[in-house]
């Protein structure tokens, strides 16, 4: 019988079909530790689940992981529900997770702690960014459910404390999957309106699941970005949500939020009354001081003898005018003198004057130079004549005029001794008026007496 060989693809698909048709492998509950966690840009999660002795690849697609509240991390122990299948490209089996929650810690509690740490690290809880709640808000916006005790408590408290204030209610869902987007949209709408001085965002008490919308990241970031100051009022006094940490001010209850947003009109009236009394008292004191000053002025010389005072002032004015005229004349004289001095200085230092002085100096120098040059030439001329006379006395030509001559060999060297030539050598004899070409036919040596 001939053997049939399977392809790798065929074998892998066969194994995959066997696994996927096994009902025990289509609804598997596992617990393990996350490692090699990767969050794909498309939202899918890829990681490994492991225990002390084994490991399995895990995939959680975006459609399923968007429902989990916490962020999976390496080292986290989790409980998962999914189905087993084979990834044909690698031939490996893996679990496709449909639900996941932390092992030992509540899903919502872990998500709360993770988001709290992350937002705090980003600075969203910092006091630096907290806006001041206005003390006398004219218009108060309320973002909460249109039904329930919270809205009634807020409106009742505001109207009781501050009946002249305006209240604008932005009805929203406060629990369920659509609650967070509803709250975010209401905050944006309020910020787009004009005239709202402060916002109250909150709801009545409830379980962590019921209050969860106020722990959503989108709500926290919307509160942080709000240009209008926000007072959070979520649940009871012991309930703390992420919104409470981000808000500009936290109120323990909705009623307390209304008291923080709206001033007490009775207290305001008391303040106005006290300030009115202080103002009236200050005005009475001011009027009394002015009356006393008026009485003093009425008793003064100016009030009793106004004509004399007028005449005195008129006389003072005349004198002041005279002094002004004299001062003006002195000032003009002073400036005229300064102008004359400047004119004299300018005339003295005028360029034409300077040129004339320079021209005279140059002419003087030229004459001096000519005299010195003439003297120098005369001195040089006298020295030249003396040198010429001395040179003439020492000149060989002068000696030649007395019958002497100079004898040269063929190389035109002056012969100083008979030893410098031989018989038959050609020599030249230079006389005063010419040169003789001669030949040596005889040599007669003489002894020099005393070297002469």
From Swiss-Prot:
Heterooligomer composed of large and small subunits. Belongs to the XseA family. It comes from Bacillus cereus (strain AH187). It holds the Pfam family tRNA_anti_2. It comes from the Bacteria. It is found in: Cytoplasm. The gene is xseA. Keywords: Cytoplasm, Exonuclease, Hydrolase, Nuclease. PANTHER family: EXODEOXYRIBONUCLEASE 7 LARGE SUBUNIT. One of its GO terms (cellular component) is cytoplasm. Bidirectionally degrades single-stranded DNA into large acid-insoluble oligonucleotides, which are then degraded further into small acid-soluble oligonucleotides. It is an enzyme of class 3 (hydrolase). GO terms for biological process: DNA catabolic process. Its EC number is 3.1.11.6. The lineage of its organism: Bacteria, Bacillati, Bacillota, Bacilli, Bacillales. It catalyses: Exonucleolytic cleavage in either 5'- to 3'- or 3'- to 5'-direction to yield nucleoside 5'-phosphates. HAMAP family: Exonuc_7_L. One of its GO terms (molecular function) is nucleic acid binding. This is Exodeoxyribonuclease 7 large subunit.
């Amino acid at each position: 019988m001939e053997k049939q060989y399977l392809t790798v693809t065929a074998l892998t698909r066969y194994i995959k079909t066997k696994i996927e048709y096994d009902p025990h492998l289509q609804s598997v509950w596992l617990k393990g530790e996350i490692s090699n966690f990767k969050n794909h840009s498309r939202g899918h999660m890829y990681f490994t689940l492991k225990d002390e002795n084994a490991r399995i690849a895990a995939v959680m697609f975006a459609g399923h992981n968007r429902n989990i509240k916490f962020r999976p991390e390496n080292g986290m122990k989790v409980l998962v529900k999914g189905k087993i299948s084979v990834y044909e490209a690698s031939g490996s089996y893996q679990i496709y997770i449909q639900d996941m929650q932390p092992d030992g810690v509540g899903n919502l509690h872990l998500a709360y702690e993770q988001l709290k740490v992350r937002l705090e690290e980003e600075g969203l809880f910092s006091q630096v960014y907290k806006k001041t709640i206005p003390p006398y808000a004219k218009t108060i916006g309320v973002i909460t459910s249109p039904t329930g005790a919270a809205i009634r408590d807020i409106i009742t408290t505001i109207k009781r404390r501050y009946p002249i204030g305006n209240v604008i209610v932005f009805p929203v869902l406060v629990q369920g999957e659509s609650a967070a987007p509803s709250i975010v949209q209401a905050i944006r709408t309020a910020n787009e309106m004009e005239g709202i001085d402060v916002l109250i965002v909150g709801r009545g008490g409830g379980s962590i699941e019921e209050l969860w919308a106020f722990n959503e990241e989108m709500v926290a970031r919307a509160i942080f970005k709000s240009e209008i100051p926000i007072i959070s009022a979520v649940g009871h006094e012991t309930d703390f949500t992420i919104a409470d940490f981000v808000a500009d001010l936290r109120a323990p209850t909705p009623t307390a939020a209304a008291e923080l947003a709206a001033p007490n009109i009775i207290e305001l009236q008391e303040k106005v009354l006290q300030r009115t009394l202080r103002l009236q008292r200050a005005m009475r004191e001011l009027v009394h001081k002015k009356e006393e000053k008026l009485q003093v002025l009425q008793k003064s010389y100016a009030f009793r003898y106004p004509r004399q005072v007028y005449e005195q002032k008129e006389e003072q004015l005349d004198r002041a005018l005279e002094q002004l005229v004299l001062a003006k004349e002195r000032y003009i004289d002073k400036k005229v003198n300064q102008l004359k001095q400047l004119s004299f200085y300018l005339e003295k230092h005028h360029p034409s004057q300077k040129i004339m002085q320079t021209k005279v100096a140059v002419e003087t120098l030229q004459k001096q130079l000519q005299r010195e040059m003439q003297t120098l030439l005369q001195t040089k001329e006298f020295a030249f004549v003396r040198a010429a006379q001395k040179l003439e006395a020492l000149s060989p030509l002068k000696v030649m005029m007395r019958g002497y001559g100079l004898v040269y060999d063929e190389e035109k060297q002056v012969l100083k001794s008979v030893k410098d030539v031989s018989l038959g050598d050609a020599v030249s004899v230079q006389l005063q008026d010419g040169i003789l070409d001669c030949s040596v036919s005889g040599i007669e040596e003489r002894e020099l007496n005393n070297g002469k």
